[in-house]
Amino acid sequence: MKVEIINKEQVEQLMPIWGETACICYDTPTKFKNGVAKTVLSTGHFSGSRGQYIYFKIEDVPRSLADQMARHSVGTAVNMQSFRYVKMEDFTYYTPSLIEKYPEAKAIYEDTMEVIKHNYNEIVGILNEKGIKGEKANQSARGILPMNTNTKLIMAFTLEALMNFMEKRLCVRAEEHIRKLAKLMRDEVITIIPELEDKLVPACEAKLFCPEGKMACGKYPTKDQLKEILNNHKK
């Protein structure tokens, strides 16, 4: 799994541009733009940041993870490797940690992947012999590729969308591999914008309660539990 921000120079200017944009709202001199940026970040006034995107190049992740990424559709843009235009003749794949843990399961898993790889190439080869080549052959054979076939994508986030993504995907209830990806993305961002370290956090840390209800891990009270705590405090 690899993660890289590909527009680092623009990301370095995200806070100053956001601050300058917000200055117009308050008729504040632009020399104070850095301070204004920190203020609107803390108060959640994101309108001035919505025209700026952070572009992540993400490689060696399973297609199942890429599909989960694409569910974050507000404030994002995604370009994903096409299994139609790209021949996946020697695809690599993701192995879940629980399968890695048990040799018997891992052996079956790896054997299955090799069978699929062989059969994919056999199908493409047969179609090629019939004069069907390129994307027509690839798109006909791609249906047998497993969900854990590794792929790559470039995904852009506004800051607001990225914070929402982190709230969902840094949660311990998120799948292991997308939580790992979220951590890598977070590390990349805060290297450039340290002010975001306490903003790119799971929902419980952002809200001070857990929105997962009965599925809560117990680190923070649920919303109902927090209400009860506050009501008891008022008595």
Task: Specify the residue positions occupied by each region the protein language model found.
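Family-specific signature for flavin-dependent thymidylate synthase
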Residues: M1-K235
